[in-house]
Amino acid sequence: GDKELVAKETGKENPKVLSAGPEDTVFTYFMDHGSDDIVCVGGEDVSSSQLMAALKTAYEKKLYGKWVWFMEACHSGSMFGALPKDMNIYVITSSDGDHNAKMTNCPPNDVIGKENMATCLAGLWDNFYLDYVEQHPDCTIGEIFDAVHADVAKSSDQNVSEFGDLTFRDFKLSEFFGTLPAPSFRPVKMEKSTTTVPVSEVPKHLAMWRAIRADKSELAEAMKKYQEEVFKNAKKEVVLMKLGRALMNEKAADKAFKTAAETYSVD
């Protein structure tokens, strides 16, 4: 990539750019927040059309040979719906375009060494895929997708998805990811958490558990924070319903608000 141009456009002194060529394999693991057709990058939103334009430029300038993306974000599938199958790019997303991603190992399943971490320790999708790769270091990309898609579906509707050149399914992940440590250095299989929380609800969930775990000296402040999070969610619901009410009748707005995007019909 053009480091000087990126520095000029972003104002960053030493920006990271893709330094690869037509003989190189590239692996990108992206994790941040997302919504319909956007993901957050460095505090700013990047649209699906902007991402597609960047990938097209990289392809035309031969900045890579084969490129694999793993993206963890809500509605991450909405970023790659227009990805051509002939650009030597393959993508796995933690969710499709209609669903939020889920977090896992959240309170009360956030204990490490008998200590409560007071946070969600992993995304549901990346927890499954990293665990699978640890246990199957010689696996193909297709094996990862099939196994993780099935595992995630047991506890979430986020629908792990794949895009791009599906012939990449036959490649071993090690071709992009590198060689993992010897089996004796890899951890034993983790017990999966039964607690999953939509990313958008994590702040409220953490605030609730902070209040639950608070002692007398901390309880008032913890309850205040929890009430603030509950109010934020309630305010967002009311604003969305008022907008829906302005565009359609109240019953239709209520139906739209409560129905999953992939099953909703205006009829």
List where the protein language model places each region.
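Cysteine endopeptidase catalytic domains of the caspase/legumain-like
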Residues: G1-D267
